[in-house]
Each structure stands twice: as structure tokens, then as C-alpha cells.
Amino acid sequence: MKTAYAALAAGLSALALSGPAQAQVEVQWWHSMTGGLNEWVNDLARQFNESQKDYKVVPTFKGNYDESMTAAVAAFRAGNAPHILQVFEVGTATMMSAKGAIKPVGEVMKQSGVAFDPKAYVPAVSGYYTAPNGEMLSFPFNSSTTIFYYNKDAFKAAGLNPDKAPTTWPEVTLAAAKLKAAGYKCPYTTSWMSWVHLESFSTWHNTLFATQNNGFGGASARLAFNSPLHLRHFENLANMSKQGLFVYKGRASVAIPSFVSGECAMFTGSSGSYADVSKGAKFAYGLAPLPYYQDVPGAPQNTVIGGASLWVMSGKKPAEYKGVAKFFSFISTPEVQSASHKRTGYLPVTTASYKLTEESGFYKQNPGTDVAVTQMIRKVTDKSRGIRLGNYVQIRAIEDEELEQVWNGKKTAKEALDAIVTRGNEQLERFQKANKS
């Protein structure tokens, strides 16, 4: 008995000397990923949590991008915002203007003493999320761009070369006509109408989407996409729609299942849709660069970034910011970046991760998976760097509303584009007035 008491006393003494076990620092991460991408986000957090014992990242789905931003604003006002918020690319200007609500990622990394080199990131990606003073504001995460998908089996059935995707928009029209003649009721569709056919279309053709270098030059930017080139493209799409060669399926990513199921033979959308296509398509498919108009000088240039970045909210403790910095460092390693790129189709946002993926033989084994990267690693121009406009969530809704009038035959392409520019500029004027320094 004495021996047992002695052992117990010794144990308690040792426990007292060692002190209480240090609790893990929790880092709350709000995101908008669904389906397989939600699993990917959870896996990243789990891998980081298992790699060390000091920090625990807790991912939470907060609805689509609009909903998560709204929830974050409410949470910030209530004093319980997350540490990390995933924000889609068109919310960049809005987040930049949210003075006091965010902490620049460059500042977070520096103050936490965690190595961080903005030059390691693909310029077209890092440039989008960088302030005029050169400081990176948010952390590139699920960066994507617009690409062309096509059903090789459908091409073969229509007498088209399954190994040769259309490279120009006139070729897309001709391919669509052959597919329709072969019995396909949906030869071509698209997701993200404004991103693909207005934003990326503009940068791909090295033509202005808005003045002030698409908003990068200042808040006085105004929309400029009712140009002859944009009008030509939308008149062509309107004619394709009337002939049943282009079928509008809906806003945002609604059209993806129509391609994956085999209903639609050609599809333009996010490189991030590769995860859905590779998992669900029961046919041979191909990936190719976005089509363009061959007679436009400077085309093709580069497509515009999509997806989202991770913003760090203000008002947290230094220890928590260090956890954020450590997590960002972990998910930006070449190995983690490369694995994420292969799994999702999102861009490898660092040059090192792209090279690692290339050296692994992935692109040779999966032809076309490098298309998104090659479209983005080109040197950008002032016209093709990206889009940075305030109130752009509202402007995108206006774009969808007006263009839907074209697809249902109620407006001409010119009427719709002019209306978007007029209504959109009203939103830009409001944003400019609300954010005068």
C-alpha cells in the first residue's frame, strides 16, 4: 500500500512540475467549397493539424461566396469574425476597401516570422491580390481560369477530329453545327457567362474591360465592354442561340452537370471544374485553351484569374496570426500545391509547384491539364492583368440579367451590352463615392 501511495505521490508531483498541457491555438476558416472540393478543404486542414501540435485549423462551410461574405461582415460587426475568410476574386476591391476589417497577408507573415516570398507565386495570380505599394493583401488559394472542354466521343460521332479542339470562335460555331446535325440538342454551353465571355474574353484579346486598366488604376474606372469586338462576339452567341447551337443553362456553375452528363458536347468554364469532369464523365473528353478571334491583334494574350483567395480578418491575437501564417506556409509548399492542382484542376499558384507537377509526368499522363497554367504564366499587360472593380458582385448580377434578355430574344446584343454598361457604371459611381479617402 505504501508503495502504491509513493508511486501516486511521485506521479502527482511530476504532473505538477510539468504544468498543464498547452492547449492548441484554434484558427477558424470559413469557406464556400462544396462536394469534392469541400472534402479537399477538410483534407488540407486535417493534414496541417496532423503535421504539428500547436495549432488546429477548423474549416467551416458558410454557403456560397456571396453568403459567406455577408456572414463575415455580420460576424466582424459582432466581434466574432473568423481568422480566415475565403473570398471570390470579384470581391477583391470590396475587401480592399474594408478598412480596419482585414490584415494584409504580407503583414501577417512578416509579423509572425514565417518565411514568405511573393515572387514565388505566378505573377498573374499574385498581381491580382497585390496592393499598389507591392504588398500582397490576400493569400492565393483556389485560383482558376477559364478553359474549353469538349466531348471527344461526340466529336467522333459528328465526324469531327476528336484530337483537335476548335481554337477560334468561328470554329466553335462550325463544330456546333455538325454536332447539332448529328443529333446533339446542346452542342455548346457555358458556365459563368460574365467571367468567361466578358472578363476572360477581354483579357484573352488584350482589350479593355473597363477604363483605368480595368480598375487597377483607381476607383474612377468605368465599364468599356460595349466595344465593337464585344458586340461582335455577343451577336455571334445570340445567332448561335437562335439556331440551337448554343444553349444557355443558367448562372454561375449551373451548366457543369449538362456537360458531365453528356447532354452538352462543348463547354467553357472553370479549370476548377476538372474535378467534376474527371470524376463524373463517362466519355472521353478533352481540355483546350479558350477560343479566340484570330484577326484581333495581340490575341491570345492571357485569361483572367478566377476562384478565390484567403483573407485574414483583423482583431486577432498574435499567437492566432502565427497559426494562420504557419497554415499558409504549409499549403503553399510545392508538394501540397502540386497535389491540390492534380486533384482539383485549380492552378498551382507557385512556380515551384508547377515545375514539380511537370516533372512528375502528370501533364503527359493527363493531356490538357496544363492548359490553364499555360494560359496564365504569360507576361500580363495593363489590359490583361485582371479586373478590380468595386460593387462587382452587383455588376455581375446585372450582366446576367441583361444577357438573359438576349438568350430569350427580348433584347439585341447591343441593347444588352449598353444597358449593362449604363447600370454597371451607376454601381461604380456609388462605390467611388462611398470609398472616397
Give the ranges of each region predicted by the language model.
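Hinge/lid segment of periplasmic solute-binding proteins
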Residues: 88-147, 173, 199-203, 286-289, ...
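Glycine-centered hinge/linker elements that transmit conformational signals in sensory
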Residues: 173-179, 216-249
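Extracytoplasmic "Venus flytrap"/periplasmic binding protein-like
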Residues: 47-121, 157-167, 258, 265-266, ...
